[in-house]
């Protein structure tokens, strides 16, 4: 039986920004949808992060991480910054509101945060699963948590290439004969030409990072 990877989108999961600090003191962060509470006493959760992400190295180095809970009113600029750029060459925290707590950056535009100390890891072929024990947790502001399904179906967001649920074939349904595809995140703009001053609503890059698709 073939595996229909689109079925992953039917799994109920939220969207989070995992943040940590690397061995050089640099703040790192990335968007994940694979975070799960595994126990309540002691309170523990696990998160899966692609090994190529700088955030995975940071969590391994610092032995701690913060999960900021994203809500449905989270801006696409925030998701694009943390989902489609690398902390190795981008200061993701430069233009966002955050506060430091227990040595970790907390996204102030999130609906809440969970701080964990690392207690164990498990390696897969592409991802490291981090098991953390919760040391602090707080609601920042009211808001409906954003689910992975809401991100895809309502916002029409794409998955970063390092996400466990990334599908290389992700594209918009056939419609216009000319479309423009973002070479960073895969967002599809229907129609031609691109509007003047156009920026990708997902990752924020300009029109120069779009390629024309003729069907």
Tell me the role of every PLM-derived stretch.
Residues 152-153, 211-215:
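Short beta-strand-to-coil "C-cap" segments at the C-terminal boundary of structured domains/repeats
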Residues 191-192, 207-212:
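Short, non-ligating residues that shape and space the ligands of small metal-coordination modules
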């Amino acid at each position: 039986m073939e595996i229909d990877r689109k079925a992953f989108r039917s799994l109920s999961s939220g969207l989070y920004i995992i943040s940590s600090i690397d061995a050089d003191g640099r703040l790192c962060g990335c968007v994940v949808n694979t975070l799960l509470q595994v126990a309540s006493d002691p309170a523990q959760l696990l998160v899966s992060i692609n090994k190529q992400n700088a955030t995975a190295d940071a969590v391994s180095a610092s032995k701690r991480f913060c999960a900021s809970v994203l809500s449905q009113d989270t801006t696409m600029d925030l998701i694009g910054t943390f989902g489609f750029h690398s902390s190795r060459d981008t200061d993701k925290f430069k233009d966002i509101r955050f506060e430091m707590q227990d040595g970790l950056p907390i996204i102030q535009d999130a609906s809440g945060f969970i701080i964990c100390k690392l207690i164990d890891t498990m390696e897969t072929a592409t991802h490291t699963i981090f098991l953390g024990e919760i040391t602090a947790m707080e609601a920042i502001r009211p808001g409906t948590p954003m689910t992975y399904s809401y991100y895809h179906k309502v916002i029409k967001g794409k998955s970063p290439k390092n996400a466990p649920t990334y599908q290389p074939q992700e594209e918009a349904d056939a419609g216009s004969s000319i479309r423009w595809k973002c070479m960073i995140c895969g967002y599809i703009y229907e129609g031609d030409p691109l509007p003047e001053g156009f920026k990708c609503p997902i990752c924020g890059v300009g029109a120069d990072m779009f390629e024309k698709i003729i069907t």
